[in-house]
A protein has these predicted regions:
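Nucleic-acid nuclease catalytic cores
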Residues: 118-149
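Conserved catalytic cores of phosphodiester-cleaving nucleases, focusing on short active-site segments
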Residues: 80-101
Length: 194
C-alpha cells in the first residue's frame, strides 16, 4: 500500500506472486515418510528416505545452539528417493508428483536416476516409481522396467509418459483412512513374480 504525504489517497500496489518449485512432491514425500514409519513400527518393512548429499560451505553461528547453514552445494547427483528391505528383498523407488491430468513429463525424471534404476534391477532389486497425480488425487506404482522401456522407445518423439500407460502397466495404490499410502500389497505381487 502506498500513501502519499499530503493525503491524496491510497494506492494499492499490485501483489506479485512468486512461483517456487522447491516444494514440488512434498505432499507425496510426507505421505510416504508417514507410511514407511507405519511399516517400520509394525515390523512390516524397513524403508527410509535417502538423504540428499550436500557439501556445507558456510555456517552462521548466531548462538551456540542455533547454527544456520548459509551456503551449501550438492556433492553429486542423488539416486532415487527411498530404499530398504522387505521380505528379504532390496527395495528401491522414486516418488514423483505432478499436477498434470494426463501424463508425467520426462523432464522430471533425471538420467542418473534412470541409470541407478537399471543398476538396481540388474542386481535383482525390486525397483519402481510411485506417481501421484495431484489434480486427480490418484496414486500408482509402476515397475521401473516399464518406465525405462517406455522412455527408451519414445524419448525422441514424446516429452511425457501418458497416464494411460501408467494405468495399463502399473497398479493403483490405495490411500487408507489412516493416511497410509499402502503400496506393500503391490510390492508383494512384484516379489511373488520373481
Amino acid at each position: 500500500m502506498i500513501q502519499y504525504p499530503k493525503g491524496h489517497g491510497k494506492i494499492s500496489s499490485p501483489q506479485t506472486s512468486t512461483v517456487t518449485y522447491g516444494s514440488r512432491g512434498m505432499f507425496l514425500e510426507t505421505l510416504l515418510n508417514q507410511t514407511n514409519d507405519y511399516y517400520r513400527l509394525r515390523k512390516i518393512a524397513v524403508i527410509h528416505k535417502k538423504p540428499t548429499p550436500i557439501q556445507v560451505v558456510k555456517v552462521d553461528y548466531p548462538k551456540r545452539s542455533a547454527a544456520v547453514i548459509k551456503e551449501a552445494y550438492y556433492r553429486h547427483a542423488s539416486t532415487t528417493d527411498y530404499n530398504g528391505v522387505y521380505r528379504g528383498c532390496y527395495i528401491d523407488f522414486e516418488a514423483k508428483e505432478t499436477k498434470n491430468k494426463t501424463s508425467f513429463p520426462f523432464i522430471n525424471i533425471h538420467e542418473h536416476q534412470l541409470q541407478h534404476m537399471e543398476e538396481c534391477i540388474f542386481q535383482g532389486g525390486i525397483v519402481f516409481v510411485i506417481f501421484y497425480f495431484s489434480s486427480l488425487n490418484e496414486y500408482y506404482l509402476l515397475e521401473s522396467q516399464y518406465l525405462l522401456s517406455f522412455i527408451k522407445e519414445n524419448k525422441e518423439n514424446k516429452k511425457s509418459i501418458p497416464l494411460d500407460y501408467i494405468k495399463k502397466y502399473g497398479e493403483p495404490i490405495p490411500l487408507t483412512v489412516q493416511s497410509i499410502l499402502d503400496y506393500i500389497p503391490v510390492v508383494d505381487r512384484l516379489i511373488d513374480k520373481i
